[in-house]
Regions:
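Extended, compositionally simple hydrophobic/Ser/Thr-rich segments
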Residues: 1-142
């Protein structure tokens, strides 16, 4: 979606799914099953995806928007650039990487491994007891 507006969708089953917002729109969806999920928020938009099941997930926020994910994935790559938030503490991943550049925040849940990189005042909060690869700042337990 580009610009403003709202999109809703439920009970989505597919191989690859790419969902993106560029602008101030909102996307709400639930009950998604796919192999490869790509999620992108650019601008001030908000995305909420509930009850997602995916093998691989890549989610990014650039700007002041918010992405909220719940469900499960085998592997996840999260990135925030700017002041946005990526809230995935109810999205259980076996293996995850989280990168924040700016003042944004990532909240995630990893069971086996979590790699964290931060620059600026942003932070990463996590659930689970994963093996950690992280810098000295910007990481906290939820």
């Amino acid at each position: 979606m580009a610009g403003s507006g709202d999109i809703s969708g439920n009970n989505i089953s597919c191989t690859d799914l790419d969902i993106s917002i560029a602008g101030s729109g909102d996307i709400n969806s639930s009950d998604i099953t796919c192999n490869d999920l790509q999620v992108s928020v650019a601008g001030s938009g908000d995305m909420k995806l509930n009850n997602v099941t995916a093998n691989f997930t890549r989610a990014s926020v650039a700007g002041s928007g918010t992405a909220i994910l719940s469900g499960s994935t085998q592997e996840a790559e999260y990135s925030v650039a700017g002041s946005g938030d990526l809230l995935a503490s109810d999205f259980v991943a076996k293996k995850a990487s989280a990168s924040v550049a700016g003042s944004g925040d990532i909240k995630c849940h990893a069971t086996d491994f979590l790699k964290v990189r931060t620059s600026g005042s942003g932070s990463v909060g996590y659930k689970g007891n994963p093996e950690l690869d992280y810098p000295k700042k910007g990481l906290y337990k939820l």
